[in-house]
């Protein structure tokens, strides 16, 4: 019984190391390869940066960790670890299979309308706040995702046009739809109007009512047209009902009263009008009740061997994922390295848990709770905004949690 607390605390240290950063995917392998954001295995005792206070569960003594910048190039194991981490954060089983791209004109139009972004000459997208750094307000309780889905059509049904969209609900999470809109372009053809008159039409958008698959609800909007342009129609109720049914396909029937008489043409799915293809924008919220305690952490500057944060940039082009990740072009994932001597218990931000503080207080008093050593691990993680294609060719914009290591500490 005397050894039980030590063994229990030792197990807690190991569990905290593995589960605290890598997440559930780490349990599939007893010795997962290091990732840029995960704490790398420390050097063996006696090597630079090594310490007898280093947690043995952090990496063992068989050869030191080679930093990415020391490799000259990133090896295959390192790349695979980075890929697994990104996919797990996006809740994807594998990279989306992009066999045919969304028409560039349609994508550019949607991005300009929603994000004031721009497309560079080399085809890359630049959007403010999607630069690979932490998202503004990333530590808040709410995370908002934005999903853009482009229309397909089943053709004409009586006086209505059937549009359908495949809308991802972000890994079947319990999302609450904050706002959802259909964007529809109305084009004016040459038409002789009486002096002082305008073209006024009524657009109706029909969607399936929740709980009644054979019943349709309708959103109506009177549109006063001066020129060709985009118009939005609220469909929040339709998207929320879709998510609650656990479905992905959204069917919308669009009808425009008086359009034909007034030479107004709603643009649907026309190969000659790709830049005006209809699209749906969904803003959804997922609450997060977790609170983080802000701590200060050390930055690795080449002059310290203590636990610190090492910056490291991950380039999506380097790993061959720039075809489905639209923005950013890469991000600072960072990782933790360094030793954790017992006296760090008194340094602000170095003790990352109550468990660590208790163990170190035992040590400072000359007591031995068991063979427990501290590990240098991430103590603060932040979200990052990403814009990417999913398997249904939706453009998804979301704040992805736990992507960037902000601070490191000992546990």
From Swiss-Prot:
InterPro entries: Cystine-knot_cytokine, INHBB_C, TGF-b_C, TGF-b_propeptide, TGF-beta-rel, TGFb_CS
Coiled coil residues, start to end: none
Entry's Gene Ontology cellular component terms: cell periphery; extracellular region; extracellular space; perinuclear region of cytoplasm
GO BP: activin receptor signaling pathway; apoptotic signaling pathway; cellular response to calcium ion; cellular response to cAMP; cellular response to cholesterol; cellular response to insulin stimulus; cellular response to interleukin-1; cellular response to leptin stimulus
Signal peptide as annotated in the record: 1-28
Domain of life: Eukaryota
Keywords tagged on the record: Cleavage on pair of basic residues, Disulfide bond, Glycoprotein, Growth factor, Hormone, Secreted, Signal
Gene3D superfamilies (UniProt xref): 2.60.120.970, Cystine-knot cytokines
GO MF annotation list: growth factor activity; hormone activity; protein homodimerization activity
Compositional bias per record (Pro residues), positions renumbered to this chain: 30-47
Tissue expression notes: Uterus, testis, ovary, lung, kidney, brain, CJ7 embryonic stem cells, and possibly in liver.
Region (Disordered): 28-69
Covalent S-S links between cysteines: 300-308, 307-376, 336-408, 340-410
Alphabetical list of Pfam families matching this protein: TGF_beta (PF00019), TGFb_propeptide (PF00688)
Residue numbers covered by the propeptide annotation in the UniProt entry: 29-296
Location of the protein in the cell: Secreted
Similarity comment text for this entry: Belongs to the TGF-beta family.
Function: Inhibins and activins inhibit and activate, respectively, the secretion of follitropin by the pituitary gland. Inhibins/activins are involved in regulating a number of diverse functions such as hypothalamic and pituitary hormone secretion, gonadal hormone secretion, germ cell development and maturation, erythroid differentiation, insulin secretion, nerve cell survival, embryonic axial development or bone growth, depending on their subunit composition. Inhibins appear to oppose the functions of activins.
Subunit structure: Dimeric, linked by one or more disulfide bonds. Inhibin B is a dimer of alpha and beta-B. Activin B is a homodimer of beta-B. Activin AB is a dimer of beta-A and beta-B. Interacts with FST and FSTL3. Activin B interacts with BMPR2.
Protein name: Inhibin beta B chain
């Amino acid at each position: 019984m005397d050894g039980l607390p030590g063994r229990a605390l030792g197990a807690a240290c190991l569990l905290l190391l593995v589960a605290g950063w890598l997440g559930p995917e780490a349990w599939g392998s007893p010795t997962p390869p290091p990732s840029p954001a995960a704490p790398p295995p420390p050097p063996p005792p006696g090597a630079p940066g090594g310490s007898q206070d280093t947690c043995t569960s952090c990496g063992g003594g068989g050869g030191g960790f080679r930093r990415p910048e020391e490799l000259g190039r990133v090896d295959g194991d390192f790349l695979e670890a980075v890929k697994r981490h990104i996919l797990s954060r996006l809740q994807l089983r594998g990279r989306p299979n992009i066999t045919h791209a969304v028409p560039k004109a349609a994508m550019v139009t949607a991005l300009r309308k929603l994000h004031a972004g721009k497309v560079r000459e080399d085809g890359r997208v630049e959007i403010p706040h999607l630069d690979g750094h932490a998202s503004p307000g990333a530590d808040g309780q709410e995370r908002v995702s934005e999903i853009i889905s482009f229309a397909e059509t089943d053709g004409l049904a009586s006086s209505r046009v059937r549009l359908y969209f495949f809308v991802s609900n972000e890994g079947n999470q319990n999302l609450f739809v904050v706002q959802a809109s259909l964007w529809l372009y109305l084009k004016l053809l040459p038409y002789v109007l009486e002096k002082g008159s305008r073209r006024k039409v009524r657009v109706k958008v029909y969607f399936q009512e929740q709980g009644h698959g054979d019943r349709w609800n309708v959103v109506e909007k009177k549109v006063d047209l001066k020129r060709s342009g985009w118009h939005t129609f609220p469909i929040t109720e339709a998207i929320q009902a879709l998510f609650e049914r656990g479905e992905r396909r959204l069917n919308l029937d669009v009808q425009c009263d008086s359009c034909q008489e007034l030479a107004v043409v709603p643009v649907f799915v026309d190969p000659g009008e790709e830049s005006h293809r209809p699209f749906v924008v969904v803003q959804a919220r997922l609450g997060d009740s977790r609170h983080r305690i802000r701590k200060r952490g050390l930055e690795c500057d080449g002059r310290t061997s203590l636990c610190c944060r090492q910056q490291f940039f991950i380039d999506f082009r380097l790993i061959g994922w720039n075809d489905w990740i639209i923005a950013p072009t890469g991000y600072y994932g960072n990782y933790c390295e360094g030793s954790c001597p017992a006296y760090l218990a008194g340094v602000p931000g170095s003790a990352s848990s109550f468990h660590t503080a208790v163990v170190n207080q035992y040590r400072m008093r000359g007591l031995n709770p068991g063979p427990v050593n501290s590990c240098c691990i991430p103590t603060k993680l932040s979200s990052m905004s990403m814009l990417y294609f999913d398997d249904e060719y939706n453009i998804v914009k979301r704040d992805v949690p736990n992507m960037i290591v902000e601070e490191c500490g000992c546990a």
